[in-house]
């Protein structure tokens, strides 16, 4: 299957190059991208202004990422209500407990996260998350922001254009191209940057070079980061479970990007890329020490590398545009833990989770009168395997072993979208539909002791978007979409047996896909005269219904050796979420600007006939900003206030927090307000210095996404707090 995918994809690319070279050269010069308004490709698979998209999309450009002094995805969404990233403190164990082991776990969009949010890097899916026992693998640590040209976040189902996993939303990372470093008419460009963040004593160093010669251009980029543990506001040190200071930790990461572009003819190009990411984190988990555990050490490694070959042609074969790509990616995570015990024998855990994928994708655009058709498809095959190893295994087990068998996971899909322009383009109706198939094929695996099962199925995902430019300044939009998520290999075939303690976990080949239906309706104002400046804003409301959510449940048994409890992943939960989001910008010709953003949502989950509040939704969050950019562009800055409401205690029912007094329930945090300051100085046209002062008033606070599930009576709540007052610095040089 892999050989077939690669050979078919390469053949398609080669076939496309010939017609491209025969096309008439285009006389339209490329527009300067710095003069264009923010655009999204994620929303409609074609470049669309974010204020003309039928759904809410946020685009972070490389310049914005640098201006925020963001070093990871949690920094990236710092000022983005409605989106969060779970990142708990490292307080895990060797055989039990996963708190903080996954690092930045991934994005949560409008209350749902994990594998329910599609994440791609240059169109290639980020590997699944995985949790089993003390092993926990997140999805937010596979890419380095310094290498990104843009990051797009789409709210709402994305399956009609992108297939499985786009149940709650999608996030697309796009890496830099040679043209991003090369100024018009120049044949060479370079950039170097150093940065520092006191929150984790992190030092970032990056270097990029790009060159152009004739029809060829290339890019070589590298970023290295060294950091320690992210600080907390906890004051209890020492060893043991009462510790609230962050456990000592050191992280080293390196990322490399190579790109080569051949401009075959004007508007037609062939490009090849290779990217490599590596991260190594060592931790001394002092909070895990006790009278019986003398030392707890961890070493976690993440590796991802991939290559891609793509072709794009404008006005080829009678089409407005066509593009195709073939790609391969390998991702490996390894989590090693050593536990020095007394009097028990020392033990280790050496767990891995590996993903290898190859794929091919293509799409084309054709305008026919008032119709702008986009049609395309993609196919991929992922080989997924997880191995549990170490010493002193649990009673009844032998190492090495696997929680699920080695699985080939194939996805294929075809889609069509029609952008219909009516009323001289003032009204756009955008229907789309996609058919997807999925197939899980297991292989004989000597490390998997259970009975294995294969599974396959298909799904159809429609959507309908509408954008109406009612007046020059007023726009109405709406988007109805369905999403789906196919079961993962570990959900279908997870197996574990511990008869001595009376429980087992068994495969379930009858799992159905998770599905969603979402409606978003909103209004936009664009460049309205207000207070002597120009005002733009958006107000949107949404309602989403999710069915057949997959969760692990006890389906039978009595927790005895004779009648063990049987755990199984089943379609168990239905979810309803509704909310409202708003954002606005006001700016003046003298360089002053103001911004506002807010998001509020509520939801409920129904499991086995019992309805409770959905605890994964973030509480109300409001962001207010005031900025100044000197008209000549030499210097500027922002003051940003972020206010977050405490979680309603009634919304934590069903979280399962353990308390000495059950009436106290789960921790809900407090209302808090933060002030962050950022500033920049363009020393000249080649040197830019930036500084940020975050949490200016040294507020003690926790994000709900991090403290969720912790008991209200916990003595270590301060361990989940964010850093106090901290500084970020950056110096960039361009040539």
Features from the language model and the residues they span:
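Membrane-embedded beta-barrel scaffold of Gram-negative outer-membrane proteins
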Residues: 228, 319-339, 477-481, 510-570, ...
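Extracytoplasmic beta-strand/coil segments of soluble accessory domains associated
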Residues: 74, 78-125
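Transmembrane beta-barrel wall of Gram-negative outer-membrane proteins
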Residues: 198-227, 237-281, 303-313, 421, ...
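Gram-negative outer-membrane beta-barrel transporters
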Residues: 25, 422-423, 427-429, 436, ...
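Outer-membrane beta-barrel domain signature, especially the mid-to-C-terminal portions
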Residues: 245-249, 283-287, 294-298, 335-337, ...
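A beta-strand signature from Gram-negative outer-membrane beta-barrel systems
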Residues: 141-191, 734
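Flexible loop and strand-edge segments within Gram-negative outer membrane beta-barrel domains
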Residues: 247-249, 267-322, 330-355, 390, ...
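Short acidic/polar hinge/loop motifs at secondary-structure boundaries
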Residues: 107-108, 125-155
């Amino acid at each position: 299957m892999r050989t077939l995918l690669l050979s078919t994809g390469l053949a398609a690319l080669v076939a496309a190059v010939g017609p491209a070279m025969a096309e008439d050269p285009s006389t339209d010069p490329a527009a300067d991208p710095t003069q264009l308004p923010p655009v999204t490709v994620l929303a409609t698979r074609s470049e669309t202004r974010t204020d003309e998209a039928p759904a809410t999309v946020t685009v972070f450009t490389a310049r914005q990422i640098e201006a925020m002094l963001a070093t990871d995805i949690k920094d990236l969404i710092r000022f983005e209500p409605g989106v969060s990233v779970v990142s708990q403190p490292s307080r895990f164990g060797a055989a039990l407990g996963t708190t903080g082991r996954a690092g930045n776990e991934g994005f949560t969009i409008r209350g749902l996260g994990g594998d329910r949010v599609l994440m791609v890097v240059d169109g290639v899916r980020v590997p699944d998350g995985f949790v089993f026992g003390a092993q926990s693998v997140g999805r937010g640590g596979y890419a380095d922001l310094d290498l990104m040209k843009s990051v797009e976040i789409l709210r709402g189902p994305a399956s009609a254009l992108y297939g499985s996993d786009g149940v709650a939303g999608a996030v697309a990372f796009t890496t830099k191209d040679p043209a991003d470093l090369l100024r018009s008419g120049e044949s060479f460009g370079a950039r170097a940057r150093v940065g520092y963040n006191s929150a984790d004593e992190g030092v970032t160093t990056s270097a990029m070079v790009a060159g152009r010669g004739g029809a060829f251009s290339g890019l070589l980029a590298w970023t290295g980061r060294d950091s320690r543990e992210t600080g907390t506001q906890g004051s209890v040190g020492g060893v043991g479970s009462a510790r609230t200071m962050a456990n000592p930790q050191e992280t080293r990461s390196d990322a490399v990007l190579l790109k080569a572009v051949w401009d075959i003819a004007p508007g037609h190009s062939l490009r090849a890329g290779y990217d490599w990411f590596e991260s190594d984190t060592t931790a001394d988990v002092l909070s895990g020490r006790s009278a019986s555990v003398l030392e707890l050490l961890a070493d976690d490694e993440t590796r991802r590398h991939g290559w891609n070959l793509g072709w794009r042609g404008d006005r080829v074969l009678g089409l407005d545009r066509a593009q195709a790509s073939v790609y391969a990616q390998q991702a490996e995570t390894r989590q090693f833990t050593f536990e020095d015990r007394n009097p028990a024998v020392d033990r280790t855990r050496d767990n891995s989770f590996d993903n290898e994928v190859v794929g091919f994708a293509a799409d084309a655009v054709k305008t026919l009168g008032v119709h702008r058709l986009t049609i395309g498809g993609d196919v991929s095959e992922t080989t997924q395997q997880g191995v549990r190893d170490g010493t002193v295994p649990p009673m009844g087990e032998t190492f090495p072993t696997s929680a699920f068998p080695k699985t080939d996971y194939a996805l294929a899909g075809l889609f069509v979208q029609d952008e219909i322009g009516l009323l001289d383009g003032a009204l756009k109706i955008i229907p789309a539909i996609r058919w997807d198939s999925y197939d899980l094929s297991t292989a004989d695996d000597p490390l998997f002791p259970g009975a294995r099962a294969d599974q396959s199925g298909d799904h159809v995902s429609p959507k309908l978007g509408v954008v109406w430019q009612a007046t020059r300044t007023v726009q109405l939009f709406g988007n109805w979409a369905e999403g789906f998520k196919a079961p993962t290999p570990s959900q279908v075939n997870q197996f574990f047996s511990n008869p001595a303690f009376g429980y087992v976990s068994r495969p379930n080949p009858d799992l159905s896909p998770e599905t969603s239906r979402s409606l978003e309706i909103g209004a936009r104002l664009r460049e309205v005269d207000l207070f002597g400046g120009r005002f733009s804003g958006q107000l949107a409301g949404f309602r989403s219904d999710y069915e057949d959510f997959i969760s692990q449940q006890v389906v039978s048994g009595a927790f005895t050796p004779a009648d063990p409890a049987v755990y199984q992943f089943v379609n168990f939960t239905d979810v309803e979420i509704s909310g409202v989001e708003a954002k606005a910008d006001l700016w003046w010709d003298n360089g002053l600007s103001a911004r506002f953003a807010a998001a509020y949502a509520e939801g409920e989950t129904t499991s086995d006939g019992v309805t409770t509040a959905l605890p994964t939704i973030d509480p109300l969050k409001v962001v207010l900003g005031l900025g100044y950019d000197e008209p000549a562009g030499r210097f500027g800055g922002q003051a940003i206030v972020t206010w977050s409401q405490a979680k309603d205690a009634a919304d934590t029912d069903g979280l399962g927090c353990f308390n000495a007094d059950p009436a106290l329930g789960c921790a809900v945090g407090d209302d808090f307000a933060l002030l962050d300051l950022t500033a920049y100085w363009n020393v000249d046209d080649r040197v830019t210095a930036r500084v940020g002062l975050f949490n200016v008033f040294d507020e003690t606070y926790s994000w709900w996404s991090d403290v969720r599930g912790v008991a209200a009576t916990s003595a270590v709540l301060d361990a989940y707090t964010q850093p106090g007052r901290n500084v970020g610095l950056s110096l960039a040089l361009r040539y």
